[in-house]
């Protein structure tokens, strides 16, 4: 399997491609990483150095890949945080090129905008760009509950309303939706859930909620779910494997006391997920 991953990169730490590439490689995926920024570290530190890559330069890299005549062998395109409107246009164009070479290729979009605690933290033009131009060409999206609400103009705060919001998102274009953080009032205290929906049904999985903030965990989640889903075609299987790997990665990081994900040290959790959490069908 080959995945073209168009995301940010950092020298220190693990976000964007610096979070997604190694777990994908560890489960046997050939990754073609294209960088949209090249920073010293992620912006959560409050200070960083390094360049934003101009959209035209990102496009040039993709054109160079196209000239190697490999776009027809790409199984999926993966994108995450989009720092500018121009990058969004480049990604949409890249998806069109890949699908022209292989109509069966999947575009997986992590529509990064913010979260319930922090609100929207991207440039003002990005949410509308994602909703109106990027998500409609995606086959798979991986929003959190907050992002799902923005995309669909809804308030998903129960299982029923979250499922309804997912169906509204699917009506926009993507057939498969992974909601990476579902919080509802009737869930047991100290837990959090993930929900996956495709044309065959809806599945939810519940895990303990770990007391931590982990930059890059959403990037790992989107990458692993995309690979497992493209490989198996089964949302239930992809959900079960992904949540196991990501939970164990986060638990290992929490135990270490380190701020950055223990991405390399946790590699066995990607290659051989324990699948310790039960997945339930809810639709």
From Swiss-Prot:
Substrate binds at residues 8, 219. One of its GO terms (cellular component) is cytosol. ATP binds at residues 110, 147. Pathway: Cofactor metabolism; pyridoxal 5'-phosphate salvage; pyridoxal 5'-phosphate from pyridoxal: step 1/1. It is an enzyme of class 2 (transferase). One of its GO terms (molecular function) is pyridoxal kinase activity. It catalyses: pyridoxal + ATP = pyridoxal 5'-phosphate + ADP + H(+). Keywords: ATP-binding, Kinase, Magnesium, Nucleotide-binding, Transferase. Its EC number is 2.7.1.35. Signal peptide: none annotated. GO terms for biological process: pyridoxal 5'-phosphate salvage. Its cofactor is Mg(2+). Pyridoxal kinase involved in the salvage pathway of pyridoxal 5'-phosphate (PLP). Catalyzes the phosphorylation of pyridoxal to PLP. NCBIfam families: PRK05756.1 (NF004398), pyridox_kin (TIGR00687). Homodimer. This is Pyridoxal kinase PdxY.
């Amino acid at each position: 399997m080959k995945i073209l991953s168009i995301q940010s990169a950092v020298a220190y730490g693990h976000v964007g491609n610096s979070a997604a590439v190694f777990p994908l490689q560890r489960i046997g995926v050939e990754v073609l990483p294209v960088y949209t920024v090249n920073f010293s570290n992620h912006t959560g530190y409050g200070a960083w150095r390094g360049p934003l890559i101009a959209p035209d330069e990102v496009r040039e890299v993709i054109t160079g890949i196209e000239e190697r005549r490999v776009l027809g062998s790409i199984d999926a395109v993966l994108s995450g945080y989009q720092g500018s409107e121009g990058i969004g246009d480049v990604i949409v164009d890249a998806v069109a090129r890949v699908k022209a070479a292989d109509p069966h290729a999947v575009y997986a979009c992590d529509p990064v905008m913010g979260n319930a605690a922090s609100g929207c933290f991207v440039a003002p033009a990005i949410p509308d760009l994602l909703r109106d131009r990027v998500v409609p060409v995606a086959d798979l999206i991986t929003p959190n509950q907050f992002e799902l609400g923005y995309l669909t103009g809804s308030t998903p705060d129960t299982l029923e309303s979250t499922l309804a919001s997912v169906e509204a998102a699917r009506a926009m274009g993507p057939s498969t939706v992974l909601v990476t953080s579902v919080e509802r009032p009737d869930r047991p205290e100290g837990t959090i859930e993930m929900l996956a929906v495709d044309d065959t049904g809806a599945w939810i999985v519940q895990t303990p909620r770990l007391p931590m903030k982990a930059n890059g965990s959403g990037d790992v989640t989107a990458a692993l779910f995309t690979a497992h889903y493209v490989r198996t075609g089964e949302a239930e299987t992809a959900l079960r494997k992904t949540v196991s790997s990501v939970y164990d990665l986060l638990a290992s990081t929490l135990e270490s006391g380190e701020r950055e994900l223990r991405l390399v040290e946790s590699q066995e959790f990607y290659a051989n997920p324990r699948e310790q959490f039960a997945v339930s069908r809810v639709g």
